[in-house]
Amino acid sequence: MLSFNSIKTILDQSSNLDLSEIKKIYLLGTTGAGKTSLVRNILGTNKYSFPTSTQTKTTIAPTEYIVKKNLPFKTTILLKEKNEVYDSIELLVDEAIKKAWDNSKVNKNNLDDIKYKLEESADGRFRLKQMVREDTLKEKAGDIETKILPLIKEHDDNESLLDNIDVKTIKNNIIKDLFEDIENTFLKLNIDNYKLFDGTPLIIENIHNKEDFILRNKELLKTDFGSLVLLAEYIRIEGQGLLADWLPANLEFVLIDGEGIGHSLSEKRDTLSVRHYDFFDYCNQILLVGKALEPFIAGGQGAIESIYINGYNDKLKLIFSKTDEIKNNDKTGFLRRQLSNLEDALEKQKISFDI
C-alpha cells in the first residue's frame, strides 16, 4: 500500500498541477450517510448516477475531484501492486477454506457459504466479485469443498489447516485462477496502451465532452462486476467542466471523497482509523456528513471525538444529508434538537461542542 506522500508525489509528477492556493476539502461519513450524493450534486452528475453507490457499500478508494480554471478532463488511477492484490485474494481463499471446515464440524454442507467468503472481505474493502465472474467463484468454492475439505476435515483445530502440502498446491491453483480472471476482466475494459501491474498510473484523457467523460469513468469505477475499483489505490478526477451548473463558474477546489467510516470494529466503537489523518493535515476543511434522522451516531460521534482530541476541530463542519426524509414541519428545530443530543453525548466524553 502506498503512503499518502508517495501518492501525492506520483500524482504531482503525472499532472504537474499547482494546487497550493486552492481550498482542499475532505468528505467524511459513515456508510450510507450520503457522501456520494453530495458529490453528485456538486459535480452535477445525478442524471448519470455517478459516482456510483449502493445503500450498503461504501467508498473504498479515496477519490479526489479537482475543479480548476482551464483544466481539461482527465482521470488518473493509481493501481495496487500485483503482490498486494495476490495477497488479498489469498486471504479470501483462506477464509473460505476455514468456513468449509467450520461447516463440516456441524455437518453443514453449504456451497454458498464458501462462495460468499470468496466474494469479498469481511470489511467490504476488497470485493473479488467486481472482477471475477460468478461461475468462476462458484467453481472455486466447489474446488474447496470437494478437493481441499476432504484433506482437512479431520483436523481438530484450524491453526494447521493450511499446512498440508497438497492443500497448499490446490489453494495456490485456486488463487492463480482467480487472479487470471481479474486480468481477463481488465482486458475487456478496452484501455489502450496500458499494461496491468507495470507500476504506472492509468490515465483517461482526451475526452472533451463532460457526458462522455463521466460515462467512461462510470464504466471503469462502477460498484458491480466489470469495474476496476478492486485494483484502485487512489483516484484523481479533474477538469474545469466538472462543476455543476448551479455553482459559480469561477469556483476552484479539491474535493476528496474519503473511505467511509466503519470498515473496522474499532472505528465503529470509538476512534478513527489512522488512514484519515494524512487527509486532515492536507485539507483546509473536514466535512462530516450525517443522516438527518439519526446524525453522527456510532462512527460519526467517534469521528467527532477523534477530530477534537487530535486538534482538527477548527477545520470541522457538519453536513446533514437526506433532509427530505424528515417529516417534521419544523426541520430546523428538529435538526437543532438532534445536535443538542449530540452535544450532550460529547460532553460525557469531556468534549466541548458548540452548536
Where are these regions (language model features)?
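Globular "head" domains of long coiled-coil molecular machines
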Residues: 17-355
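N-terminal pre-Walker A segment at the start of P-loop NTPase domains
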Residues: 1-19
